[in-house]
Amino acid sequence: MTSAEHLNLDDRAVDNMRFPKLPARAAYIHLNNPARRNALSLEVLEDLRSQLLTNLTSPKSGRLMTLPPFKPGIVHELERVSERAAPDSKETSEHSWLVDANAWAEERAALPNVLVLRSSGPVFSSGHDLKQLASLSHAEVKRTFALCAEVMSLIRHSPAPVVCPIQGLATAAGLQLALSTDYSIALSTTRFQLPGATIGLPCTSPATAVSRRIPPAQTYRMLLTAEAVTADVMRDAVDVVAEPEHAESTDTAAAAFEGRVAEVVERLAGSAGQPMALGKWAFWTQLGINGKAHDGKGGDGYEDAASWAGRVMALHARAADSREGIAAFTEKRKPSWKT
């Protein structure tokens, strides 16, 4: 099998692909550098940052609407906001939009509830532009890696979940980008790689995202050997789309891939925005709660995390979307979301 044949969706009518129309409340983030295998050059990273900021900034106040730090203590502030939230209340706080439907509507009314990060061509992203890196000054190299980290952080803290269709090879920082999103999708034969060790530049930064999606030992093997793996062995990290057997055309695999992407985006775009945002913040926050022998319940942190998450569930239950969802369920009708 040639290398071209081995790339998933490689040369499968993806090169000239026109991105499908998105449902309402969804928007694209476009990684646009196909001539350079979608390498993350300084200019491309600046463009990704700009697109993210546009989709995360309140049109009304000009405020950047990102999730708060993943720190358990912030739940105290959210509880105070939730307890005093009322239709006629004028009291607000920095994060009131996470629990108050009125504040959400005021700040995020024109912003998307789901983002879709896509590139075109047979390679999703080959990572940093090594040719450019070699020509940059040390200060510019530091700027490139700092900008890369900022882009990943904006994705992680986006209230709108970020879906990432990985239509081709994802390596190094390109894999980091894909796995920093909330929901990545790939065909079973899609190749992933941390190739830096082969050129004396271990993929230390990309490994931070990968090791948070798959077991650390598996990540370290990829980091150490630089060997490529397929999505089929990374099912914990990616929604893997099986390629149809006995397909008469490679377009069949592309259709299965696009069908799954559309299904996921439609489902998320049809969901209430505020619960998804609060749920995302709570999920990543509780993962960082470890057992504390002195001021917690010790052990692996499960009991502390469960107790803390119960407080977030109470916030969910007080919210307008939860009340609407429960009412719709009991009345056997579709909910009319507030956010």
In which residue ranges do the predicted regions lie?
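Catalytic-core regions built around general acid/base machinery
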Residues: 51, 103-107, 147-159
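Structural motif
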Residues: 118, 158, 165-166
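Acidic, divalent-metal-coordinating active-site segment for phosphoryl/phosphodiester hydrolysis
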Residues: 226-233
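Conserved CoA-thioester-binding segment of acyl-CoA-metabolizing enzymes
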Residues: 1-118
